[in-house]
C-alpha cells in the first residue's frame, strides 16, 4: 500500500512539474522541464518591448541586410526595416484585423493580416504572428512545435509550422533572459536577427 501511495504521489509530482508544457510541445535537449516551464511563464507575461538591431534576409529573388526597430505594446506593433534588399525603408504597423505596410517610394497598403500583406507586397512568406513569440524565445502557442533546450533550459532550437529557428545567444535584460541572436529558416526565406538593444516591459500588470 505504501509503495502504491509513493508511486501515485511521484506521478502527480511529475505531472504538476510538466503542467506548463502544452500538448503541442515536444521537448528535447539537455535542459530541465521544470526550469523551462518557469522561464516560459515569465516570458509569456512579457507584453511590451522595444528592440533595436540588425536583420539579414535571403529570399529567392533578392537578399540584403538592414536595421530593425520593433515597438510592441500588447496587441499593437510597429516594426520598421531600413535598408534591406535595396527597398529603402519599410514600416509594418497594426493590430489584429487591421494591418498597414508603408514602403518607401511605393506607397501604403492595408490588409487584415501581416502575413497576407508581406506576401502580396514583398513576396515574403513570413509568419509575423508567430514572430511575436519566437523573438522572445518561445513557441507560438496555437500549433505543434518541437523544442530543443540548451544547458540553461532555454530554447536552442525550435521547429514549428515548417520553420526552424536557431537561438545562438542570450542576454539578461531587466530580469529576463532574451535572445540576442537567432536564425530563422523557412521554405524560401532565411532571416538572421541580431538584437543590439532589448527594452522589455510588462503593461498588463
Curated annotation (Swiss-Prot):
Residues 1-17 form the signal peptide. One of its GO terms (cellular component) is cell outer membrane. Keywords: Cell outer membrane, Chaperone, Lipoprotein, Membrane, Palmitate, Protein transport, Signal, Transport. The keyword Nucleotidyltransferase does not apply. It is found in: Cell outer membrane. Pfam families: LolB (PF03550). A lipid is attached at residue 18 (S-diacylglycerol cysteine). It comes from the Bacteria. Coiled coil: none annotated. InterPro entries: LolA/LolB/LppX, OM_lipoprot_LolB. It is a lipid-anchor. GO terms for biological process: lipoprotein localization to outer membrane; protein transport. Plays a critical role in the incorporation of lipoproteins in the outer membrane after they are released by the LolA protein. Belongs to the LolB family. Monomer. This is Outer-membrane lipoprotein LolB. The gene is lolB.
